[in-house]
Amino acid sequence: YADGLNIPTGMEVGHGVVYVGQGTELLELRDRDGDGVADERKILLSGFGNGDSHQTINSFVWSPDGELWFCQGDGIQSRVETPHGISSLYQAGVYRLRPGNLRLDGLLDDFMGPGNPWGVAFDDFGQSLVADGAGGISYLTPASIPAKRRLRLPRIGQPGGYCGIECIGAANLPKEMQGEFIVGDYKRNRVSRLAISEDGAGFK
């Protein structure tokens, strides 16, 4: 479909295009003639950090309300020029993009949450969790509004090294698994299930 990419670490399909994160850029690839090869390659946004090539923007996923969310790992500092001004994210965090107007919000700036996020998932009610390659799972929804006061998000469940997270909602899987999360646990070389329960205003 597309060649000549430079260490792409994130990809998602939507609106008739493929969004790709590579190095400092967010690309939009489009196949105009339906031959399975991208005819157009457009840089939507640039200025994402590349201080560590395996922690650049990654893990693209659509939210239930049509926003594109993706992560940025430790050792990365981004200053992205958008039509709405500069969007900055210092160190590890999560981005929320509205593709229609290119509004980009940086969330969890400067270690408010996971130290190396690799994956965001939403449950049936739109609640979001983020997987951390350096520590565990965090409840992300409280950080959905960019904050000036930095508070660290609490962890959910056991610490681990996670890469990728998804909420189970497939009819071909057992009923008792529906609504649970699956995570890739690279430190233990396995895929794990995570069942969460309410804990005050958050989850455990």
What are these regions (language model features)?
Residues 1-204:
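Beta-propeller blade termini and top-face loops
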